[in-house]
Amino acid sequence: MGETMLPTRRLLVLGAAAALLTGCQTTPPLDPGTVIGTIRVDVSRLVELGVGPRAEVVRTRLEQELARAFAGMRQPGGATLTVAVRGLTMPTYVGGDIDDGATSDYLESLVTVTGRKGEVLATYPVLSMNGAGDSGFWFSPGIDERRVERLIVNHAAWIKKLTLG
């Protein structure tokens, strides 16, 4: 009986937490007429944390994904979208775990949109997550690269959703 109740309790707790967090996003989406001129991704914090060459991969690929995501609203001289990547977490994954969040990959950033005169138009904290096993078997060649790629694509999608609504 205890085992069958555990998922129900977990869902109840997660549901309550989600309900409490519903109103936490206080920054509204950008105005519909806002155009983006420049996209910058700062990974200096990842370098400080010792992420190594993966930091440059995050910078390059996130810039590419954001350019694709905002392609319809890019215009020279528009606002600047700056993404300061604050953390990349990829725990060791050896498969077989129940997805309880302990084997999840995370990418965290602070997105700031500034106007032509340098005024801050909006700021959005972004935390995206993927299951570590979502990218394939733990023993597959290139699994860590696929995990990073999935995080980047997911993160860019969340940035677009938060900034555009």
Segments (PLM) and residue ranges:
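Short secondary-structure boundary motifs at beta->alpha junctions and helix caps
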Residues: 119-158
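Short secondary-structure transition/capping segments
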Residues: 6-16, 26-35, 112-132, 160-165
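A structural "domain/chain start" motif
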Residues: 2-7, 11-15, 22-61
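Surface-exposed short loop/turn segments
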Residues: 72-121, 132-141
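Extracytoplasmic/secreted envelope proteins and their assembly/folding machinery
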Residues: 59, 63, 67-70, 149-152, ...
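Sec-exported extracytoplasmic/periplasmic mature domains
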Residues: 67-71, 90, 156, 160, ...
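Soluble non-cytosolic domains of exported or imported proteins
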Residues: 52-61, 101, 142-150
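Generic secondary-structure microfeatures
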Residues: 10, 62, 66, 85-89
